A protein has these predicted regions:
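Short helix-loop capping/hinge segments that flank enzyme active sites or metal/cofactor-binding pockets
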Residues: 64-85, 252, 309-365, 381, ...
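An N-terminal boundary/leader segment
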Residues: 1-44, 49, 482
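A short helix-breaking turn/cap at a secondary-structure junction
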Residues: 186-271, 480-482
Length: 482
């Protein structure tokens, strides 16, 4: 029954000696062993070490002292633990140092019990690596739980753990939260610790945080891990707020049902937003259907260009470490194509792309001067089936020949093969490239019995607005969490 509670309640039980850290950790291990066979959410455990750390957990003043947590098996390194990044290339790799974000979790009192499933290098919006296999959805295991923090979402939605560490470089916290009926906050760029393994993940698009079941957990965790980190390339001032303060009703909310890349949006996704709009109007908010004037298609092409180039650098570093050239069989086909596409991008094109990001951030900031919130569906549809293939065989054949193409043809091919999966999740990426905070709230269940979230975006540094908006929905019984 312990894992029915959120992390705040488990921490309170530990503080008041009604539960020991060891009991909390043992309960989480028991839940994982019972449920993981069906869901494939967790890919490694550190039982002996976690139980030893739980026994030594005596400083109960820390906000999450003794609470068990999973790290994501991608870019959240703990010294001595697996460092696979979801890739067969690194199936035996171990982390040689601990990341600052992981240290922040430990300093908040969490006991790290293992790692959650993630797709290879986090490139996809479902979790389906050849190394680990698919992470399945607790609402219906025939469906995906999303990606790239799919294992984290499966583990939290199935109550293996009260919350799980995650990261978001294009929606990888918010997409799984939408697909599994959870809360997914992507903080402002520079809000949470980075390094030393990576300092500017995808030029600052990627940020670490967590997938959660309660707004109070989300707020307390943000307060616990936020930082101003002098060596980091991006900083944002520390946030101080009281979650009990009401959200002023004179805040304007803009909403849109349109895909930024002109793809189809399901009726379920539209209904999720319109229901939220009705609720907000009842609460006295001023609502307007409008959107920032942005070229969504160009922005997503710019987003993929960063993925291409940053990945090419990563693979070049891997080649140097391995002292050999990487081959197509070393990795999954998507990873190979992204790597190949990034090899020959001109520096002028890359610089122009970053300027486009900055201009988009300027446009969004001006838009959020007038409207405190921008509301959209989080995802354009509910979770896809595990049997669904986003990339068909003829496209795969084309991808296998990517090295024969010109530089422009390669980047065009990346956009082309990602389009079917992008169409399912086109709403999340812009907040990453602009640096804004965004939250997915679990407010809707579609007629197929699967959940779907709505997304609120706010000005940089204003996670407090997003959390108070989340609390408004939560305390009025609008959340649909299993």
């Amino acid at each position: 029954f312990v894992m029915e509670f959120d992390a705040t309640e488990i921490a309170n039980l530990i503080k008041t000696k009604q539960l020991s850290p060891k009991e909390a950790v043992m309960t989480a291990f028991s839940e994982i062993k019972t449920k993981n066979g069906q869901l494939n959410a967790v890919v490694s455990l550190r039982e002996e070490k976690a139980l030893e750390e739980a026994k030594r957990c005596v400083d109960l003043a820390r906000p999450f002292a003794g609470v068990p947590i999973l790290l994501k098996s991608l870019g959240q390194y703990l010294e001595g633990e697996p460092a696979t990044d979801g890739s067969k290339l690194f199936k035996d790799a171990k982390a040689t140092q601990t990341d600052n974000f992981v240290k922040a979790l430990q300093q908040a009192g969490f006991i790290i019990i293992g790692q959650s499933n993630a797709p290879e290098f986090g490139f996809t919006n479902v979790t389906d690596s050849k190394l680990y296999g698919p992470a399945r959805n607790p609402w219906n295991p025939e469906f995906y739980s999303g990606g790239s923090s799919g294992g984290a979402a499966s583990a939290v939605a199935s109550k293996m753990v009260p919350l799980a560490a995650a990261s978001d470089g294009g929606g990888s916290i918010r997409i799984p939260a939408s697909f599994t009926g959870l809360i997914g906050l992507k903080p402002t760029r520079g809000r949470t610790p980075v390094g030393p393994s990576s300092w500017r993940g995808w030029q600052g698009a990627s940020v670490s945080f967590a997938i959660t079941r309660s707004i109070r957990d989300t707020a307390s965790l943000l307060a616990a891990v936020q930082t101003v980190q002098p060596p980091a390339p991006f900083q944002t001032p520390l946030l101080s707020f009281n979650l009990e303060d009401q959200l002023p009703k004179n805040r304007k909310v803009a909403f849109s049902l349109n895909s930024p890349v002109q793809t189809k949006v399901s009726e379920a996704a539209k209904q999720a937003v319109l229901s939220a709009v009705n609720f907000l109007e009842e609460q006295g908010f001023e609502i307007e259907e409008t959107e920032p004037k942005l070229d969504g298609t160009q922005l997503i092409k710019d987003y993929y260009l960063v993925n291409d180039v940053e990945s090419a650098v990563m693979f070049s570093n891997i080649e140097n470490a391995l002292e050999r050239k990487l081959k197509i069989d070393d990795m999954e086909l998507i990873s190979w194509c992204i790597c190949q596409a990034g090899m020959d991008v001109k520096a002028t094109d890359y610089s122009r792309m970053l300027a486009n990001w900055d201009q988009a951030a300027f446009v969004m900031d001006a838009f959020l001067e007038k409207y405190s919130f921008f509301l959209t569906p989080t995802t354009a549809q509910t979770a896809p089936e595990v049997s669904h293939q986003f990339i068909n065989e003829s496209m795969r054949a084309k991808m296998r020949r990517i090295s024969e193409l010109s530089s422009r043809e390669r980047t065009d091919l990346v956009y082309e093969f990602f389009m079917p999966s992008l169409a399912a999740t086109p709403f999340t990426q812009q907040a990453n490239l602009m640096g804004n905070p965004a939250i997915s709230l679990p407010v809707h269940v579609a007629s197929n019995g699967l959940p779907l979230g709505v997304q609120f975006v706010a000005k940089k540094g204003r996670e407090d607005l997003l959390l108070k908006m989340g609390k408004l929905f939560e305390q009025n019984g609008k959340f649909r969490i299993i």
